[in-house]
Amino acid sequence: MAAALVLRTWSRAAGQLICVRYFQTCGNVHVLKPKYVCFFGYPPFKYSHPYQWLKTTAALQGQIVQFKLSDIGEGIREVTVKEWYVKEGDTVSQFDSICEVQSDKASVTITSRYDGVIKKLYYNLDDTAYVGKPLVDIETEALKDSEEDVVETPAVSHDEHTHQEIKGQKTLATPAVRRLAMENNIKLSEVIGSGKDGRILKEDILNYLEKQTGAILPPSPKAEIMPPPPKPKDRTIPIPISKPPVFIGKDRTEPVKGFHKAMVKTMSAALKIPHFGYCDEVDLTELVKLREELKPIAFARGIKLSFMPFFLKAASLGLLQFPILNASVDENCQNITYKASHNIGIAMDTEQGLIVPNVKNVQIRSIFEIATELNRLQKLGSAGQLSTNDLIGGTFTLSNIGSIGGTYAKPVILPPEVAIGALGTIKALPRFNEKGEVCKAQIMNVSWSADHRIIDGATVSRFSNLWKSYLENPAFMLLDLK
């Protein structure tokens, strides 16, 4: 099968130069291998068509495209390159991961919008990349079809199986999709595309393959089966282990970036807020018992149940009674916005620094649903893979500093929020019961901070007392759950 590009017309009396490009067949695949042959006179092949003048162009052209860092949103103008998933010379397809970048709010994976070959990386690891500037150069491969005076030709029969398109139509598909069809011996002309303008997508190939052959697609990943919880052991006092020094040697200077840069902005803004502090202790004896009863049930559902879901739900119930604590103020403190959703943030310590993802809509979630979301956020936070959506939109914050150590803290408000709580370590301490007898109690201290410009001390105290009552008597939460 051949397509001819006639560079000049010729007369039957005088031969002119003709350049011919052949499409050679390799197995079941058409591979474009240009072979330029010069003839004087008529070409040595015959057109299987009654018309004499056939002008067709088929050419593969490579183009270097500067792949620029697009706007990530949230006013982010610069990011830090944390990891490259490609190197120069690698072949990429659309939606393949190019690199991972980190802003002062979240880590984002950048994906390719082109099929082609990576020609240049503009940044090294830990370099600062700017929105709108080139990230990589990609040499694209686009089949450029320009037809003049197109005349349909009869289909050419081959002994070998070939992928031929419907006459007069062009099948839209990326090279990756064509490769998938080729590997599974599928004619693209028989597949109905679901993409724009009938473009054939990868899903269309997989669906076609499943219908034709009954192929079983790879199963979706199942929930990881957690090992049975270990039996509780006698509590022993841990012996401090001295670790080798983290840093020795000469002084060095490095720029503040990533989450540390976000902390600079947030804490500088928080310094302008007059903080009101309030501390109290909470007896969690009954909650500790309840959690031990619910842990096996949560484990059967694949959920790791900590105390935090109870703390968040109790806080949400309290915010329903004191909505001023779930509000925000503008920069000049002229307007108060009361938030309908309780998006409660959790201060999380990671290798990348302090991050505060939030659980969305705590007011409509159950304890188990909150625990499931916390498990997800903690897993992504440890891997540095939290999305921007996980980190924005917070309305109230709890900091579980007690998981590391400490009894009291002085939490700093995260603008534009107006309140935050810090939770201390749960300790077994002697306390008096209602009969005046000394008994063992599970005590946790809590420290609150509120924006004293719009929140008075009495409001914080009443909120804390209500939150405390829910945790000291977990059954009370059932009365107010909706």
From Swiss-Prot:
The keyword Aminoacyl-tRNA synthetase does not apply. Its main location: mitochondrion. One of its GO terms (cellular component) is cytoplasm. It is an enzyme of class 2 (transferase). Residues 146-171, 218-238 are annotated as: Disordered. Expressed in kidney (at protein level). It catalyses: N(6)-[(R)-dihydrolipoyl]-L-lysyl-[protein] + 2-methylpropanoyl-CoA = N(6)-[(R)-S(8)-2-methylpropanoyldihydrolipoyl]-L-lysyl-[protein] + CoA. The modification N6-acetyllysine is found at residues 196, 202, 243, 250, 289, 295, 304, 435, 440. The modification Phosphoserine is found at residue 220. The keyword Transit peptide applies. Residues 157-168 have a biased composition (Basic and acidic residues). SUPFAM superfamilies: CoA-dependent acyltransferases, Peripheral subunit-binding domain of 2-oxo acid dehydrogenase complex, Single hybrid motif. The active site is at 452, 456. It is found in: Mitochondrion matrix. The modification N6-succinyllysine is found at residues 133, 196, 261, 289, 440. Residues 64-139 form the Lipoyl-binding domain. It comes from the Eukaryota. InterPro entries: 2-oxoA_DH_lipoyl-BS, 2-oxoacid_DH_actylTfrase, 2-oxoacid_DH_E2_comp, Biotin_lipoyl, CAT-like_dom_sf, E3-bd_dom_sf, PSBD, Single_hybrid_motif. Binds 1 lipoyl cofactor covalently. The modification N6-lipoyllysine is found at residue 105. Residues 172-209 form the Peripheral subunit-binding (PSBD) domain. Keywords: Acetylation, Acyltransferase, Lipoyl, Mitochondrion, Phosphoprotein, Transferase, Transit peptide. Forms a 24-polypeptide structural core with octahedral symmetry that represents the E2 component of the branched-chain alpha-ketoacid dehydrogenase (BCKDH) complex. The BCKDH complex is composed of three major building blocks E1, E2 and E3. It is organized around E2, a 24-meric cubic core composed of DBT, to which are associated 6 to 12 copies of E1, and approximately 6 copies of the dehydrogenase E3, a DLD dimer. Belongs to the 2-oxoacid dehydrogenase family. The branched-chain alpha-keto dehydrogenase complex catalyzes the overall conversion of alpha-keto acids to acyl-CoA and CO(2). It contains multiple copies of three enzymatic components: branched-chain alpha-keto acid decarboxylase (E1), lipoamide acyltransferase (E2) and lipoamide dehydrogenase (E3). Within this complex, the catalytic function of this enzyme is to accept, and to transfer to coenzyme A, acyl groups that are generated by the branched-chain alpha-keto acid decarboxylase component. This is Lipoamide acyltransferase component of branched-chain alpha-keto acid dehydrogenase complex, mitochondrial. The lineage of its organism: Eukaryota, Metazoa, Chordata, Craniata, Vertebrata. The gene is DBT.
